[in-house]
Every structure is written in structure tokens, then in C-alpha cells.
Amino acid sequence: KRQACIIICSIISVATGSSWTTSATVGIALVGIGKALEIPAGMVGGAVIAGAYFGDKLSPLSDTTNLAAAVSKVDLFKHIKYLTYTTIPSISITLIVFIILGINQSSSGVTDNSFLINTIENTFNISLILFIVPIIVLIMIVKKTPPIKALTVGTLLGALFAILFQPQIINELSDSSNSSIIASYKVLIDTITSDVSITTESEILNELFSTGGMIGMLNTIFLVMATMIFGGSMDAIGAIKSISKALLNLADNIFKLFASTVASCLALNLTASDQYLSIVVSGKMFEKAFEDKGLAPENLSRTLEDSATVTSALIPWNSCGAYHSSVLGVSVGEYFIYAIFNWISPFMTLIYAALRIKIRTLGIKNQ
């Protein structure tokens, strides 16, 4: 069922905090299964993108979630709480549409997954005990554990379970010239930090079982640092104030302020081609304006996520759009219409602003 793609990707994305990781792992597998079932690649790709970004938005481990909260100067979990008000309706509409699509369009293909299942069983020791690691991470997320602590615990538990339950994988990846303890340590460090690939008889599984580790995230980290420096420089020279003044002259009421913020995020995603730059610059640009209107900062952080984070995957030349289309092997043009959650989110935040639903005020300024 097509909606199952959304649910699976949502769970993985919440647990990992990364839409990119979700696409590069289960996303690839789901697209492969979809092709075997002769389901349009764009439909499966759209479901993967929708689920991945739903989880990315609500995960306290997500880089964009932390960035939007930090730029808007909002407590992380308060930011996530306010995100649910617009995010849950958006994903609900998406699921309903995919259920309807599933009823009206049945798959004509037939796939035999026994080869993939047997390959996985022959490669790994599969046990329900292995679910302990993601369950503990999810519990820590629910308990509002700081992201770094949750990531550290998840990493250490994953390493321990790898030693206990997957010794054959460690032996395969290790240098046999070293002692078992040293070899295991080296494999675990390499897995956490750099590229590791587990070879099987299936090309789909080979892609699924490949990882870039922490080094694979360095480009993203450098990009975030660069955007923060750029945003700070723009603020220091007064450029943000000049641009925001021109925009704010048009935003003479609360709805227009929200609309201007959404427009700014979309424009930066289109021109700067990066969601981090869109979040940082728009956040700094409208922070004072929201305060002057007597609006709590969580309104701004939510709007940044609803318009900057999710729409980045809908633009072919944006870093997110280019990445997802490349990894999934599905062009943005193919999955755009099916990534319903992503393009409905900006409209949802505008509807809430127009109807003044869940718009928290500071209570100290004129409304």
C-alpha cells in the first residue's frame, strides 16, 4: 500500500532526524519495490519524500528543526509542539489522498521478495532483540532527552549490538592481521566516521547497506556553518534590516507578515538553492517583526519549517531536490505532484494565520 511508504519513512526519519538518510536507505528499497510492482516511480518517490520530511520536521535530532528553533530563539520542544498543529493536518491529508490513489489505481506487477529476504537473513542475524536500540532512541525522544545525548546513546547501543549480534559482519569488514578486539574497535570507528559497504548478491541491498558515516555529513555541517556566517554578516552590515524593512512595509497585518515570511523562504529556496540559508536569513529578517506584532517566536520557527524546510525538496536545483532525485532515481518533476505534504505545508500555515488558529501572542504588544 502506498500510504505504508509514508508511514515507514516517517518512522525512520523521526528516529534518525534526517530526510536524506531516510531517502538513501529505505527510500531506495521502496522505490525498487514500487518498480517491481509497476507503481509509478513518481508516486513512490513522492510518498518517500512526504514521509521523510514529516519525520524530519518533528524529530528533535533533525538539523533543520534545531536550526529553526535556534534562529528564532525558541525552546526546541516548544518549537516541535507548535509544529504539530500544522504538520499533523498536512500529513493526514496526504495519507487520505494516497489511500484514495491506492483504491483507484491497483498495481499490475507482481514481485517475489523471497530473494531479498533470504539475502538479508543470510547476511545478518535477524532478531526482535535488535529493535531495542531504535525503541530506546524513540523513548528518549518522547522523554525530551537532549539530541546529543540521544544520538550518543543510540550510537553506543548500536555498536554494542553489532558486536553481540553481527560478529560475522565485523569479521568481514575487519583487518584479519589485528586481534579481534582491535579489529572490532577499528570496524566500529570506521562505520561511525567513514564509508562502509556490505556486499551482498543484490544491488538494491548493496545500496541500502552502504553508509558515509559522520564524514558523509561534513558537507552539510560546513554548509550550515557557512549560512550562519553569511546570515550574521548580512545582519552586521544592515542588509537584512534594509531588505526586511521593504518587505515589512507590505506586511501591515499579521496575515501579511506570515505571507511575507513564507514568500521569503520560497524565494531563497529558489534563488540561494539551500534550505539552511532560507531558514537563517528569513529567521533573522523577520524575528523583530514578529516581536513588534506581539507574536511569540514559535510562530516564526513553525513558519520557517512549514515553508523553508519542506519546499526545498520540490526545487530541482536546490541542494535537497538535487540530492533526493539523484538518490531515488526519480526526477523532481515526477514526484512533485505526489509530495503532497511538502507543497501543502506552506498553505496550511497561511490558513492557520488567516483564521488565527494556534497563533500564540506575547500579550505585551498591540495585536
Tell me what each language-model feature is.
Residues T145-S264:
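Transmembrane helical segments that form the transport core of multi-pass membrane transport proteins
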Residues K1-I7, G34-V44, T123-F131, G212-I221, ...:
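Membrane-interfacial loop-to-helix junctions in multi-pass transporters
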Residues C5-S13, P89-G102, I129-K143, T152-Q166, ...:
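Hydrophobic core segments of alpha-helical transmembrane domains in multi-pass membrane transport
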Residues V31-P134, L138, K293-Q367:
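Membrane-core helix-loop-helix motifs of multi-pass transport proteins
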Residues K1-A29, L223-G231, I237-M285:
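Hydrophobic alpha-helical transmembrane segments of multi-pass integral membrane proteins
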Residues A4, Y85-I93, N219-T227, K256, ...:
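Hydrophobic alpha-helical transmembrane segments of multipass membrane transporters and ion channels
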